[in-house]
């Protein structure tokens, strides 16, 4: 079946306008971005093929330029467009967190942290510095490590928190293995940071561990 033979309400753009973006499948959303198919495949068929070939929509989005462009129907122009869309999405999430509002949505915070850390190949330790009303003052990647570990120094965290005049912190780091379950080392360093920051009356509100498509909150586990 070609797109021309589909009823209007089944066309991705028309379906989005009538029912909203949530009603569309991953392939239909990607089809709107791609706009055209290739010889022998309409744009929806091409989108479905690409998602299956890459393994998921996320893996397609995180592919390198070389990996992306070697697929039929894709090229450098589409790669540039996609990177621009992803960067705008990340900036939107960052702006939402930094616009001066208090952090009241753990899910939104988790979504932003995941967008920053999820696809990094090396472990990185990320901090949101907050004021006494839990508004974001500053965010930083403070430490980066090897593929499986980052050296986190409590003295440096305290120093940066005092520099930003922070009243509270939210911590996050990624597991490049993709497994979000916190290790005993993760729990130990979190406890050391809680104790060190407590000496200067700065609280840790949460520590998120970001994996592949999942994340774990220390606060939700009752560990903070």
UniProtKB/Swiss-Prot annotation:
Keywords (alphabetical) are:
Hydrolase, Metal-binding, Metalloprotease, Protease, Zinc
Pfam families attached to this UniProt entry: RadC, UPF0758_N
The protein's GO terms of the molecular function aspect are: metal ion binding; metallopeptidase activity
Q: Does the keyword Chloroplast apply?
A: no
- Where, if anywhere, are coiled coils annotated? none
- The motif JAMM motif: which residues? 173-186
Q: Which SUPFAM superfamilies match?
A: JAB1/MPN domain (SSF102712), RuvA domain 2-like (SSF47781)
Entries under InterPro entries matching the protein: MPN, RadC_JAB, RuvA_2-like, UPF0758, UPF0758_CS, UPF0758_N
Q: Does the keyword Hydrolase apply?
A: yes
PROSITE patterns recorded for this chain? MPN (PS50249), UPF0758 (PS01302)
Identify the residues that bind Zn(2+): 173, 175, 186
Domain annotation MPN: ranges: 102-224
One biological process GO term for this chain? proteolysis
Q: Which family does it belong to?
A: Belongs to the UPF0758 family.
Q: What is this protein called?
A: UPF0758 protein VIBHAR_00653
Task: Please report the organism this UniProt entry assigns to the protein.
Answer: Vibrio campbellii (strain ATCC BAA-1116)
